[in-house]
Amino acid sequence: MNIRKAAAGDLSRIAEIFVFNNRMNFYPIFKDEGFSFGELQVVSLADAYFKNIISNIYVFDDGVVKGFIQINETEIVKLYVDTFFQSEGIGGRLMEYAVKEFHADHLWALEKNTRAITFYQRHRFQLTDEKKFEEGTTEYLVKLALCPAERVEG
């Protein structure tokens, strides 16, 4: 298995994957240059954000950290794969790991991020009727839940 608990030495790589994915996927939606290219920086994110939640992060590492997943109880909080390694099954393996090892059963996705929603649906998560505003924005997050037949009883 190429998935392991994140270590302090992974922080800059995790932040790098997060920053570039955010710029690619969310800048077209929010169009906030100040955030995407100003506030959103690898070093400050690794230092101020990711080091505080490292205990909840797992990385896909086959010699290079290619993606990561953050889990909080049974919620998938973040799932990112380096853009260079997308479409290689890494995201799916991280999702399977979260479901199997942590009984992950739900997540929230930006409503306009249809690519992500389609990915989650391919991996047995379905849209629910729940939605909420992304904090500090006018954009909605939609809740996806693991199909009931797919849930693992623990």
Regions found by a protein language model. Name each.
Residues 2-16:
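A short beta-loop-alpha structural element at the N-terminal edge
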Residues 19-46:
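Conserved GNAT-fold acetyl-CoA-binding loop/helix
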Residues 54-67:
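Conserved beta-hairpin
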Residues 87-100, 118, 122:
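Conserved acetyl-CoA-binding loop-helix of GNAT-fold acetyltransferases
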Residues 76-86, 109-110:
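A short, internal acetyl-CoA/4′-phosphopantetheine-binding micro-motif in the GNAT/acyltransferase core
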